[in-house]
Amino acid sequence: MSRKWLYSTNHKDIGTLYFIFGIWSGMVGTSLSLLIRAELGNPGSLIGDDQIYNTIVTAHAFIMIFFMVMPIMIGGFGNWLVPLMLGAPDMAFPRMNNMSFWLLPPSLTLLISSSIVENGAGTGWTVYPPLSSNIAHGGSSVDLAIFSLHLAGITSILGAINFITTIINMRINGMSFDQMPLFVWSVGITALLLLLSLPVLAGAFTMLTTDRNLNTSFFDPAGGEILFYIQHLFWFFGHPEVYILILPGFGMISMLFHKKEEKKKHFGSLGMIYAMMAIGLLGFVVWAHHMFTVGMDIDTRAYFTSATMIIAVPTGIKIFSWLATLHGTQINYSPSILWSLGFVFLFTVGGLTGVVLANPSIDIALHDTYYVVAHFHYVLSMGAVFAIIAGFIHWYPLFTGLSLNPYFLKIQFFTMFIGVNLTFFPQHFLGLAGMPRRYSDYPDAYISWNIISSLGSYISLLAVMLILIIIWESMINQRMILFSLNLTSSMEWYKSKLPPAEHSYNELPILSNF
């Protein structure tokens, strides 16, 4: 048994490991977010120590991004579905695939260790010096966090190499690039983004480590360096990273809309591919919109504003293509379609607040306020997470051979929908009123919206517990899937046996072009 999991080279087993790891990390991250909302539910102090509060905020961000969304989307769905959708026997490098999973638990262990030794890493996920330098954060906490991110980065780079090689070399005969499913495209583009952006982060963090431990002065003004040089390096990684988090979600939502609505093809499939490529490319040239407040030249600001707004064009193409795919169908409100519709609506809201923040004069007022928190949580907490749950419900019968209870799933969807909106919508008002991020206390004027926001987080907690109960119920009752209701145009459902056998295909499939 232990050999099956520890030494596995099977993409389905490794994908399952990623899912288990991601769900567990997601529960840790959710617990941390509830601590944050408990602290902010009322003015005054609950935790009592702001360093601990900042450590919780930092750990919440890192865990949700690197140990929940990325392992589930790229590691879980990517490993399970890409080989099946390509008709490949497995991934290109199965043993490397196993290694890239088993580097993640040590990485998470290091991150949690960084929070519980010394004073914890209370730097925020951006890890800016001088706060992250050895003056403000002496001791080993920040070093442990950096080492943890190095490991997570190695994991992602290895995974990216594996996906790119698999997609280029292991398609079945006759499958051209434009015939690949949109989810495979989205994972491929995501892998390319990871491969290009993570080395920059590794370089920045290595320089920060030597500044802290080896007396160099890469980011130290005393050594004649520019302090915000690290911000350029960090955000050159950090902005593509947010597209890395959402692109596989785009692919999943595209698959869901045309499979669940029984369309043979998605509307504007080629346009969707080009839109994802454009988003990936533009994601690399807009990083400084996170840094409007460092004091930039007017021409630089004009460039980053326009470039940021241009990203809205391919994103708009995707949203209207999804709506066009739905057009003319009798919408079947199955749980996964509810999540997908929720994704489209809430992701659009998050995107619109992003266009607001792209304007430097507005951003200077709103930078580091709760308006920014609301913006990126609409995109991540209601974009990435909704896509994950939609995909999980849709492909759960493929992964397990079991069915979930659709009635409970609908109750859970509406609970979660109300919970997340009640949590994050009021934060727009708090931000416009000037409440800053990363503070554990606030003036009494902000109390009403904070109480509502914290109430929403408790409802979201109930929803998370509900979906865990629904999955547990399905596994206890073992309601087997007798036959797949999906069209044969989707190759992952091709086998009559669910879940697929250890070797997916006895012989490689043939693609017929009519």
Swiss-Prot record:
Binding-site list for O2: 243
Keyword Transmembrane helix among record annotations: yes
Keywords for the protein's UniProt record, in alphabetical order: Calcium, Copper, Electron transport, Heme, Iron, Magnesium, Membrane, Metal-binding, Mitochondrion, Mitochondrion inner membrane, Respiratory chain, Translocase, Transmembrane, Transmembrane helix, Transport
Catalytic activities: 4 Fe(II)-[cytochrome c] + O2 + 8 H(+)(in) = 4 Fe(III)-[cytochrome c] + 2 H2O + 4 H(+)(out)
Entry note: cofactor: Binds 2 heme A groups non-covalently per subunit.
Outcome reported for the amino acid change (mutating residue 491 to I): In haplotype 2
Protein name as catalogued: Cytochrome c oxidase subunit 1
Residues bound to Ca(2+): 39, 44
Transmembrane segments: 16-36, 62-82, 101-121, 144-164, 182-202, 233-253, 267-287, 304-324, 337-357, 379-399, 413-433, 451-471
Binding site for Fe(II)-heme a: 60, 377
SUPFAM superfamilies xrefs: Cytochrome c oxidase subunit I-like
Known function: Component of the cytochrome c oxidase, the last enzyme in the mitochondrial electron transport chain which drives oxidative phosphorylation. The respiratory chain contains 3 multisubunit complexes succinate dehydrogenase (complex II, CII), ubiquinol-cytochrome c oxidoreductase (cytochrome b-c1 complex, complex III, CIII) and cytochrome c oxidase (complex IV, CIV), that cooperate to transfer electrons derived from NADH and succinate to molecular oxygen, creating an electrochemical gradient over the inner membrane that drives transmembrane transport and the ATP synthase.
Subcellular localization: Mitochondrion inner membrane
GO (cellular component) term, any one: mitochondrial inner membrane
Organism: Ostrinia nubilalis (European corn borer)
Encoding gene (name): COI
Complex formation: Component of the cytochrome c oxidase (complex IV, CIV), a multisubunit enzyme composed of a catalytic core of 3 subunits and several supernumerary subunits. The complex exists as a monomer or a dimer and forms supercomplexes (SCs) in the inner mitochondrial membrane with ubiquinol-cytochrome c oxidoreductase (cytochrome b-c1 complex, complex III, CIII).
E.C. code: 7.1.1.9
Family: Belongs to the heme-copper respiratory oxidase family.
